[in-house]
Swiss-Prot record:
Subcellular location: Secreted
GO CC aspect terms: extracellular region
One example of a Gene Ontology biological process annotation: neuropeptide signaling pathway
Source species: Sarcophaga bullata
Keyword terms, alphabetized: Amidation, Neuropeptide, Secreted
Keyword Signal attributed: no
Predominant location: secreted
Protein known as: FMRFamide-15
Modified residues (Phenylalanine amide): F7
Protein family (similarity comment): Belongs to the FARP (FMRFamide related peptide) family.
């Protein structure tokens, strides 16, 4: 969902 988390 988040680009930095990649979920």
């Amino acid at each position: 969902t988040h680009d930095f988390m990649r979920f």
